[in-house]
Amino acid sequence: MQRITITLDEELLDVIDRRVATQGYQGRSEAIRDLLRAGMRESEALPDDAACVAVVSYLYDHSTRELPRRLNQTLHAHHDLTRSTLHVHLDAGHCLEVSVLQGESGRIGELSRQLMVERGVEHGQVQVIPAPGQPKVR
């Protein structure tokens, strides 16, 4: 096993610490490993060429330099996947976007990752559902 260093904001660290306390982990490392494993399982659930629908949601700080423009460009570059998008102004500095996507699992995963790794995106989640007629993932 290798030791690594990561940087987390205080709020995220508080969430992890609460998870450690409430779920009985021995420490942060095991809790973070479990979260990473769950995220990797979710992203590997469907073959890249499987047809699916998905909901991607993310909260971001719209004052982050050029972030709204970059997010918009990313969505436009994948316009063929986007069925609908909802944009909500949560407060003076934060927006929530929810997009319904349809297409191949690999392309949807790529788009979701591009959106969520942008600096200034604070929370992101994607839920992928096999399209009607596709085999269910176990």
Curated annotation (Swiss-Prot):
Provide a Gene Ontology MF annotation, just one: DNA binding
The entry's keywords: DNA-binding, Metal-binding, Nickel, Transcription, Transcription regulation
Cofactor note (record):
Binds 1 nickel ion per subunit.
Chain positions recorded as Ni(2+) binding sites: 76, 87, 89, 95
What is its cofactor?
Ni(2+)
SUPFAM superfamilies, per this entry? ACT-like (SSF55021), Ribbon-helix-helix (SSF47598)
BP GO terms, sorted:
response to nickel cation
Q: Which InterPro entries match?
A: Acetolactate_synth/TF_NikR_C, ACT-like_dom_sf, Arc_rbn_hlx_hlx, CopG, CopG/NikR_regulator, Ni_resp_reg_NikR, Nickel_NikR_proteobac, Ribbon_hlx_hlx
Q: Which Pfam families match?
A: NikR_C, RHH_1
What protein family is recorded? Belongs to the transcriptional regulatory CopG/NikR family.
Job of this protein:
Transcriptional regulator.
Protein name per the record? Putative nickel-responsive regulator
Instruction: List the source organism.
Output: Pseudomonas putida (strain ATCC 47054 / DSM 6125 / CFBP 8728 / NCIMB 11950 / KT2440)
